[in-house]
A protein has these predicted regions:
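PLP-dependent amino-acid enzyme catalytic core
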Residues: 1-494
Length: 494
């Protein structure tokens, strides 16, 4: 039986996996979400010796069950290849008291590569499957990493255009240059004078604008998304949690069946939601620890069951988590209220109208899976230094948020279960923050800090940032947040 993906806001709006990938966001504003979970046989006696690609085949064939085996083989072999700088794709590193799952070995040195290297192949395969001749326009808001990873994935892919919006003052210098120097005739990057929430809200508005959709259709185009709102972004992220567990079994750190915790630095809630889906298909998960920075709306939600975005937006050293409207939480809410689309829609409309919603009558077993805490700026910097001094290993600030939150969790609960930290970016993406935390040195430029980081860590400077300083800037457009749609129409000649 083919798996059904339903909009979180309309029980009648159901599609297959390939249709969900092509649409990105449901036309009613909801997110396509599985209403039941596939049956997957996770035999870790076998999986411990499986390659990343083999684990991907097992997981993806379960969730994307209207793709043929040959189609998935094609997508997987083209995605997880020499673009990654290690055959392991996502190596697990044992540190003092924790395991870091390094998700930054792809072409843009951030975890988004894990899904965005395969999403273009999913899309072009799905388009062929449905005889779609429209040009697919990828419209994406980024808090720093998705934009570059999406453009790297879609650059010069036939039949696609990609337009990325980022907050002008809300990304690191390295992140900005990675985007503005992006090659590819179909790539477009636009800075906005707002924050990530402004960018994401306006992108969602464009997806839901019927008149704009009709204008696109008249020009043989249609929108899709490379954000984690797209199920094709989310499902590949389930793979690395299963792979990490298999590596723990392989190295004798755990026995098969032993429960493991995952601590995930969380902004838009996609990465930790993928860990939740891994649990739903049988991965032995103890706790999912949701780590936030000072934009701690999720920490408060898990403690009070009230989601309240009415608070100061803080610009931090972990910009990919500087988010107050956490889009993917909608999928968890949908599951928490028993897959009730009417109730989910009411809550989401309340968020727009009043800036908050309160959860009542929810599945306590699901909520009990999660623990949540946050790390402030000082704690994040201190954690980078602590890990370096303990393990001679430098974490990026997002990973350090998760690492610091895990230290708090362990102290407060006494939980000694093995814990994997999702290490979401290379420190080379945030060199100034990393070097300053370790050495106390201030006032460094980004490229000066890259050299110092190399000396401190002994890790080679990755190609993603090597030469960035002298790469030609190709994208110069900057607009007011309110003018985003006009910019899109201009680029597409509508």
């Amino acid at each position: 039986m083919t798996l059904v993906y339903q909009s979180t806001r309309d029980e009648k709006n159901t599609v297959t996996a390939s249709q969900a990938i092509l649409q990105g966001l449901a036309t009613d504003g909801g997110l396509f979400t599985p209403v039941s979970y596939p049956q997957v046989e996770l035999d870790f006696d076998t999986l411990k010796d499986a390659s990343y690609q083999e684990v991907a085949k097992l997981v993806l064939s379960a969730f994307l069950d209207d793709f043929t085996a040959e189609e998935l083989d094609y997508c997987i072999s083209h995605a997880y290849d020499s673009k990654f700088d290690t055959p392991a794709i996502a190596p697990l590193v044992k540190l003092d008291g924790q395991y870091n799952l390094e998700l930054f070995h792809g072409s843009t040195i951030a975890f988004k590569d894990m899904a965005l290297s395969i999403l273009p192949y999913f899309m072009t395969t799905a388009a062929k499957k449905h005889g779609l001749e429209n040009k697919i326009v990828i419209l994406t808001a980024t808090s720093g990493d998705t934009g570059k990873a999406a453009m790297a994935g879609f650059a010069d892919v036939p039949g696609t255009e990609i337009i990325v919006f980022y907050p002008k003052d809300g990304v690191s210098k390295v992140q900005e240059l990675q985007m503005t120097t992006q090659t590819g005739n179909n790539t477009h990057v636009i800075a906005i004078d707002g924050n990530f929430d402004d960018a994401q809200t306006n992108v969602k508005h464009m997806f839901n604008d019927v008149a704009l959709r009709e204008k696109l259709a008249a020009n043989k185009m249609q929108f899709s998304s490379a954000n984690s709102m797209n199920i094709g972004r989310l499902v590949p992220q389930v793979v690395y949690y299963v792979y990490a567990y298999a590596q723990l079994v392989k190295t004798g750190q755990i026995t098969a069946g032993e429960k493991v915790n995952f601590t995930v630095p969380t902004g838009n809630f996609g990465n930790i939601l993928a860990a939740f889906y891994a649990k739903q298909i049988g991965l032995p998960v103890g706790k999912l620890i949701c780590a936030s920075n000072e934009n701690n709306v999720l920490t408060d939600f898990f403690k009070t069951h009230v989601y309240d975005k009415k608070r100061e937006f803080k610009v931090t050293t972990s910009p990919s988590m500087d988010i107050l409207v956490s889009s993917n939480l909608e999928r968890l809410i949908f599951h928490l209220v028993g897959n009730d689309a009417t109730k989910t829609k009411e809550l989401m409309e309340s968020l727009v109208a009043t800036g908050q919603y309160q959860l009542s009558n929810f599945d306590a077993d699901i909520l009990d899976l999660f623990a949540a805490a946050y790390a402030d700026e000082a704690e994040t910097a201190a954690e980078i230094k602590r890990v370096y001094e303990a393990s001679d290993y430098i974490e990026d600030p997002h990973t350090a948020v998760a690492s610091a939150v895990y230290q708090k969790y362990r102290t407060q609960t006494g939980d000694t279960a093995k814990t994997v930290i999702a290490s979401t970016a290379s420190p080379y993406k945030f060199p100034v923050v990393a070097v300053e935390a370790v050495t106390g040195e201030t006032g460094l430029g980004d490229f000066e800090a890259l050299a110092k980081l190399h000396t401190l860590s002994g890790v080679p400077v990755p190609p993603a940032v090597d030469g960035l300083e002298t790469a030609p800037v190709r994208h110069h457009t900057s607009v007011a947040a309110k003018d985003m749609q006009a910019a899109v129409e201009d680029y597409l000649g509508l």
